[in-house]
């Protein structure tokens, strides 16, 4: 039986977008790409490790930085320039990323 991640962290300022169902993807690097579709994951704040909600992983797919577009920005509930800036701050020299799609468990 293979283990899979059961916890994911987000910056605190993003968590209201998740609980409102507006943010439905996250873009991560390879080290955080091991989530498994159809599994439930607990969401915590990065800063304070406070549990926020539960999500169900829908898909995990490779994504190059240059391919991040308006569609991803909509799913992230953030403007495209700000999204790309945030990704670059977190992953300064990484172009091989992963998009993790999820849904809020109510």
From Swiss-Prot:
GO MF terms listed in the record are:
hydrolase activity, acting on carbon-nitrogen (but not peptide) bonds, in linear amidines; N4-acetylcytidine amidohydrolase activity
In this chain the ASCH domain maps to 9-105
Where does the record place the catalytic residues? 23 (proton acceptor), 26 (nucleophile), 76 (proton donor)
The keyword Hydrolase appears for this protein: yes
Q: What is its EC number?
A: 3.5.1.135
Spell out the SUPFAM superfamilies in the cross-references: PUA domain-like
Q: Which InterPro entries match?
A: AC4CH (IPR008314), ASCH_domain (IPR007374), PUA-like_sf (IPR015947)
Keyword Hydrolase found: yes
GO CC terms:
cytosol
> Would you tell me the protein name for this molecule?
N(4)-acetylcytidine amidohydrolase
């Amino acid at each position: 039986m293979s283990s899979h991640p059961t916890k994911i962290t987000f910056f605190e300022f993003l968590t209201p977008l998740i609980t409102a169902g507006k943010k439905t993807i996250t873009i991560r690097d390879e080290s955080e790409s091991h989530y498994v579709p159809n599994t439930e994951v607990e969401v915590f704040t990065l800063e304070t490790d406070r549990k926020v909600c539960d999500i169900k992983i829908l898909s995990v797919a490779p994504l190059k930085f240059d391919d991040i577009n308006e569609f991803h920005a909509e799913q992230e509930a953030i403007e495209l320039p700000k999204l790309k800036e945030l990704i670059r701050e977190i992953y300064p020299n990484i172009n091989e990323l992963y998009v993790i799609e999820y849904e809020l468990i109510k």
